[in-house]
A protein has these predicted regions:
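Hydrophobic-ligand binding "helix-grip"
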Residues: 1-27, 33-41, 127-128
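Terminal "cap-and-tail" regions of soluble proteins that handle hydrophobic small molecules
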Residues: 35-129
C-alpha cells in the first residue's frame, strides 16, 4: 500500500510518501520518504539530520504505541513523551541518529566536514547542547 501526501511546515512543503509492505514473518515494513528542497546554505549548516531526526522521533512514537514491534525488537521501545525527550536516553538516541544521518550524507557525496557540522547542528537543535 502507498500513500502520497504533501507535508507542509514553516520552512516549506514537500512530498511525503508512505509505503507499507508485508514481510514474510507476518510483520509490515513501513517506509517513509520525505523530500524537502532546502537552501544550499541551510543544508550546509544542518545537513539532512536536522529534519530527519524529527521523523525518527515520530516513528519511535508510532512503534511505541503499536504492538507490531514486540516481534522484532530485542528491547522495549521508549515512548518519546516530553519527559523522555528531556532525558539521557533521548540524548543517546538523538546523537546516534545524528551520526547515522551524517554517515548517510557522506555516502551520498557530501564532504565529511560539512556532514559532521550538520551532525553537530542536529544535536544542538534537538538537545539544545
Amino acid at each position: 500500500h502507498r500513500l502520497g501526501l504533501t507535508w507542509q511546515q514553516p520552512t516549506g512543503e514537500g512530498p511525503l510518501l508512505l509505503r507499507l509492505d508485508p514481510e514474510d514473518d507476518g510483520t509490515t515494513l513501513l517506509a517513509l520518504r520525505h523530500t524537502m528542497l532546502l537552501d544550499a546554505a541551510d543544508f550546509a549548516r544542518t545537513g539532512p539530520g536536522a529534519l530527519a531526526v524529527g521523523w525518527e522521533i515520530t516513528l519511535l512514537a508510532l512503534a511505541a504505541h503499536t504492538d507490531g514491534w514486540h516481534a522484532t525488537c530485542l528491547a522495549p521501545v521508549p515512548v518519546p513523551n516530553p519527559e523522555w525527550l528531556q532525558g539521557p536516553q533521548s540524548a543517546r538516541y538523538v546523537r546516534a541518529w545524528a551520526v547515522r544521518w551524517a554517515a548517510e550524507a557522506i555516502a551520498a557525496g557530501i564532504d565529511e566536514t560539512t556532514a559532521r557540522l550538520g551532525e553537530s547542528e542536529t544535536v544542538r537543535r534537538h538537545l539544545g547542547s
